Amino acid sequence: MGALSHIRVLDLTRVLAGPWCAQTLADFGADVIKIERPGAGDDTRHWGPPYLKDAHGADTAEAAYYLAANRNKRSVTVDIATPEGQQIVRELAAQSDVVLENYKVGQLKKYGLDYASLRAVKPDLVYCSVTGFGQTGPYAHRAGYDFIVQGIGGFMSITGERDGVPGGGPQKAGVAIADLATGLYSTIAVLAALAHRDRTGEGQHIDMALLDVQVALLANMNTNFLASGTPPVRWGNAHPNIVPYQTFQTSDGWIIVAVGNDGQFRKFVEAGGRPELADDERFATNPARVRHRDTLVPILAEMVKTRSKTAWIDALEAAGVPCGPINDLAEVFANEQVVARGMEVALPHPCGADVKLVRNPVRMSATPPDARTAPPLLGAHTDDVLRDMLGYDDARIAALKAKQAI
């Protein structure tokens, strides 16, 4: 039984940040009911290709993007623009511990589904709103997108190659880091609010903003700036204070070499057949290497190109030089450590084939998270939830379908 098996979550979110929070809670055992638009559902259901393939190898209508953030949930289709749909959500909220939503600021108020309205039917409700810029401030009513937030929040100013070198300029992260981190911070906030509720009986409203999270994620870069007044700059895959501490291209791929001291530098160049570099006064110490970075790094780059990725990893690991490969995802899921940790899971799907997903990375001895059910088909649980939770009979459900309220 999961640690959160006593918790029910009403998930009114779409795309990534909110669904990521809901999926995390579901992994730990929470009963998550995902509210979706009839006939369309979560936008990400259609964000393909690639799509999940059925037992015959043909594409289904389930986009891989949607599959990433929606396992362990029940899907209920409700049109919240209709009075009947609004009533359904209110009745479900009255039987839930948590409501998650990521609508624009104020949008749910016109439907009577904002925090104040739902608190009236469930006084101890934990209600988490996820938006781009939060419920207050001059940007509150702007739409928030991860890419834009990475720029506004400073992440891209410190990510990417240095200006003035080939490929220089700001870069976004390869995944939606602001969305994902907001999902995780939202999970933490929900759990803290539930702990407070359990002690006091008091619910509360949680106001999560992608921009707030993105700014917070810069961590020591923030404090470096706040202490010095000097904005940090991009260093690409290099380190501003340590050389060599960066990526290098081998004859068949890329590796990371993270030399942390002068002894490791000597071992690195000895492994590469260039021991004289360690005795060169320009490179003998780290401060000297930092000063002569632009001279040293091209020499090392030519040295590294002479061997394969595997040959370098074997040689440097044997010499005690910190290093690692830069793997593509095919290599990641074939990696012996990733395999040993069971990071890939397969769950049966109604399409007749298994859906391959990535397991929750948390390991717990008593209440581990679990991937129990595949991401649901659109509306797969509508009838069951209305019947079992709300007591609707078949005639009432049929009438709601005729009105396109569900």
Could you say what each language-model-derived stretch is?
Residues 1-189, 193-199, 377, 383-406:
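N-terminal helix-loop segment corresponding to the beta1-alpha1 unit
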Residues 39, 133-134, 210-217, 252-254, ...:
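Glycine-rich beta-alpha junction loops
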Residues 135, 165-177, 198-214, 233-240, ...:
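Conserved Rossmann-fold dehydrogenase catalytic segment
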Residues 163-164, 183-204, 216-227, 269-276:
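Oxidoreductase and adenylate-handling cofactor-binding alpha/beta cores
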Residues 228-245, 360:
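Active-site Gly/Thr loop motif
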Residues 243-319, 323:
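Aromatic-enriched alpha-helical interface/lid elements that frame and gate functional surfaces
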Residues 284, 352-399:
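Flexible, small-/acidic-enriched active-site or ligand-binding loops
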Residues 318-372:
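A glycine-rich dinucleotide-binding beta-alpha-beta segment and adjacent secondary-structure elements
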